[in-house]
Structures are given as structure tokens and as C-alpha cells.
């Protein structure tokens, strides 16, 4: 965002129409600038685009005082810097692989970070190899096909019944690109009482902020070509373990789907009971 302000010599004097826009927007921006000379304007704009797209994407504000618009300078072209994308560290991937290998009823939750990172392909590969039910936050809608056999629907404030049962019964909750805000789950222990949490996110400040995690992977898991980085988290044998649910669509065969994805003995027994009574 680019804003205008009073001239530099009028800043800090309670001038007419002056506003500390940098201070006002600080809580809602990733970074902001006040341009002090026309010579630094081009560099500031380039740097703003770099920081906006690096790591977790976010808004940048550039405040330009009035007198800067009246000045001129020579424009010096510069090459574009590629955004910084932190790679996941090896120890985090090992910890993730360990909790995934131990899980019997994992549940995947896809958030808006998947869309921001352009990692929908990698997330789908991850889910299909794991063969676990997948729910999407409101910001994550579009990160995974809604008509996919593994998709349970939306999680959070307005979830589907299948999503609730899958979350309540899982023994490992895998949050990918989500902040675990109250819109997702106000009480982690209440929603998934038996579950450990694996958090995968590009922003280190979000890890463990709203939910205690058993393992975490911090970095950009978007891969190149046919080798998605997310596959590094998947131990061999997970596909075989959960292959029984392959081809079962929650909307078409919800009872079979729930018997796979729910760890709750009560829910599993209910599903079996209802299934036998229907048959």
C-alpha cells in the first residue's frame, strides 16, 4: 500500500491532515516505510515487494511525504531479488516423520498458507500418500479438491459432521499452513482430546503460539518438479496402513469413511451399529 502524508518538515508537529500512518498500521502490516528522500524511493519499492513475498506473505506500507512528489532524480534500473523461502530443517522433518509413523488415525488440516505458498500440489501428494481424511479452514478452501475422496469439508466454526468426528477421533492432528486460531479450534484439547499435534508452517512465530505441538516443521514445503518436499515427512508403510480407506468418499459412504477416520470407539461402534441396521 502507498499512502501520502504532509511534507517532511511538517511531520511530528500536529499539522493539518497529518497522521502517523506508520504507527497506526504497524499491528496490521508486515513492515512499513517513510520515504525521506526521492533518491531512496525506487529502492524502497523494490525492497517492499521483496519482503512482502518472502517467508509468510504480508502487506507492506510505503508512506510518501508531499514534498517527495515535487522532487526528481535519476532512475537506476536494478535486477529483481527472488523472494526468500526458508527450507525446512532436517531435524524438523525427522520429528515429523516419527510422529507420522506412530500415528494410526491422522487427520490433515489445510490452511490458507498452502494457497499463499502455491503448495496445493504438494499438499495433495502428502494427503494421498498418507491416505488420511482432510479438512480445510475457511482460508484454506481451494487448497484441496472438495470432491476428493479424502476431503471431509470445512473445519472450524462451521464444520461438517464428518469433519467433527474425524477431528474428535484422530490421534494425530496435522495442521499445514494454519495458525490454529480460535476460528479453527477454540480449545484444542476439547476438539481432539487424544491427538498429538504436528504443525507445518512457513512462519516460525506461529509454531506453538496457539497450540502445544509434539513436532513441527518450519519452512516452505513447496517442491519443484516431481519431488515435493512434503514427501520427506512420509515414512514408507503409511500408504499400506491406511489404504483401506482409499476410494471411500465421505459424502457417498459416510459410515465406511467414519469407521476409518475416527479413533473414537463410541463413534466407530455407532457407525457399525447403524450400518448393520441399515443392511
Can you say where each PLM-predicted feature lies in the sequence?
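N-terminal alpha/beta PP-like core and its mobile active-site loop of ThDP/TPP-dependent enzymes
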Residues: 1-228, 256, 269-273
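Cofactor-binding active-site loop characterized by glycine-rich and histidine/acidic residues
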Residues: 279
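Alpha-helix boundary/capping motif
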Residues: 227-232, 250-253, 263, 267-271
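Short, compositionally biased segments
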Residues: 223-231, 236, 241-244
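Short hydrophobic targeting helices and cationic amphipathic motifs
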Residues: 243, 258-261
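Hydrophobic helix segments
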Residues: 229-232, 258-259, 276
Amino acid at each position: 500500500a502507498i499512502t501520502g502524508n504532509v511534507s517532511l518538515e511538517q511531520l511530528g508537529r500536529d499539522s493539518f491532515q497529518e497522521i502517523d500512518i506508520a504507527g497506526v498500521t504497524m499491528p496490521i502490516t508486515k513492515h512499513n516505510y517513510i520515504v525521506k528522500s526521492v533518491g531512496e524511493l525506487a529502492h524502497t519499492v523494490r525492497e517492499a515487494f521483496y519482503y512482502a513475498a518472502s517467508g509468510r506473505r504480508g502487506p507492506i506500507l510505503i508512506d510518501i511525504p508531499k514534498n517527495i512528489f515535487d522532487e526528481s532524480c535519476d532512475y537506476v534500473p536494478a535486477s529483481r531479488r527472488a523472494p526468500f523461502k526458508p527450507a525446512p530443517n532436517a531435524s524438523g522433518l525427522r520429528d515429523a516423520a516419527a510422529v507420522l509413523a506412530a500415528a494410526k488415525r491422522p487427520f490433515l488440516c489445510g490452511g490458507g498458507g498452502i494457497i499463499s505458498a502455491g503448495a496445493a500440489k504438494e499438499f495433495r501428494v502428502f494427503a494421498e500418500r498418507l491416505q488420511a481424511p482432510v479438512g480445510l479452514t475457511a482460508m484454506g478452501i481451494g487448497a484441496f479438491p472438495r470432491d476428493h475422496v479424502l476431503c471431509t469439508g470445512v473445519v472450524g466454526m462451521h464444520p461438517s459432521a464428518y469433519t467433527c468426528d474425524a477431528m474428535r477421533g484422530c490421534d494425530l492432528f496435522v495442521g499445514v499452513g494454519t495458525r490454529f486460531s480460535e476460528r479453527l479450534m477454540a480449545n484444542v484439547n476439547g476438539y481432539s482430546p487424544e491427538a498429538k499435534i504436528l504443525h507445518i508452517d512457513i512462519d516460525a512465530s506461529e509454531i506453538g503460539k496457539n497450540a502445544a505441538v509434539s513436532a513441527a516443521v518450519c519452512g516452505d514445503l513447496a517442491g519443484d518438479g516431481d519431488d515435493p518436499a512434503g514427501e520427506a515427512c512420509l515414512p514408507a508403510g503409511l500408504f499400506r496402513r491406511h489404504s483401506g480407506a482409499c476410494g471411500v468418499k465421505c459424502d457417498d459412504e459416510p459410515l465406511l469413511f467414519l469407521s476409518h477416520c475416527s479413533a473414537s470407539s463410541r463413534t466407530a461402534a455407532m457407525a457399525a451399529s447403524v450400518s448393520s441396521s441399515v443392511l
